Amino acid sequence: MFLYSKLLNRGKTMEKEKDIKYVPNIETRLRHNILKMPDCIRKSSGIVIYGRRIKSIVFTTDLAIIRNCDADAVFAVYPFTPQQVISDAIIKASYIPVFCGVGGGTTKGLRTVAIAKDVESQGAMGVVLNAPISDLNLTAVALGVDIPVIITVAKEDTDIQARLDAGATIINVACGQDTPRVVKKIRDDFPNIPIIASGGKTEESILETIEAGANAITYTPPSTQELFKEMMSKYRE
């Protein structure tokens, strides 16, 4: 009986090994130092947009990082008023889809609609609106473009239903250390809406956010300064 059990377990192990497919990894002599997103993000379900599954989203406007990372998409959101010349440069330089910030805080009203239409024509996969934007302004943007509209949620007491009614396609949860709890609350109330969330820096926090119900994770990579510091340390050895 013991021998039979041992053989059975061995057979199951061999079956699992057969299921693991070899994935060719192509690099070149110079372009091999790719910034990798945390592997644990792959455990998320992802969000399928225009047939493309998005799981990992790099949160940066640094073109050097965008061109040298393995993320599924880019979150091009920055703490200044959106400028079309910036979005155009990022979209043109990126291998991967770009979600562009179009305002919501400092930038409001008709300007957000105009910028949203501009980035759509430039090739953005979606637009991102910041938490302070009004429902009326959100509706104007949603009616003005034919790409997903992502609304950022920064507080637990946000009226999610009102945001959805106003035209939001995807919810982006950015509540700091409370993100997993807020994601879970939203997921419990809205089982089927797409949720993007910031996962933090550690594998534990990312997995906690995914388990709470996030479909995709935004990840803030190390800065070029930090990466250069690490490289120079190796050069000094």
Named regions from a protein language model:
Residues 15-33, 45, 52, 196, ...:
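Alpha/beta catalytic cores of nucleotide-metabolism and tRNA/nucleoside-modifying enzymes
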Residues 123-135, 169-182, 213-233:
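Glycine-rich phosphate-binding active-site loops on the catalytic face of alpha/beta enzymes
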Residues 7-100, 104-110, 121:
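Conserved N-terminal beta1-alpha1 strand-loop-helix module at the mouth
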Residues 110-119, 158-165, 201-215, 219:
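Catalytic cores of alpha/beta
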Residues 65-66, 90, 118-120, 141-142, ...:
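Generic structural signal for hydrophobic
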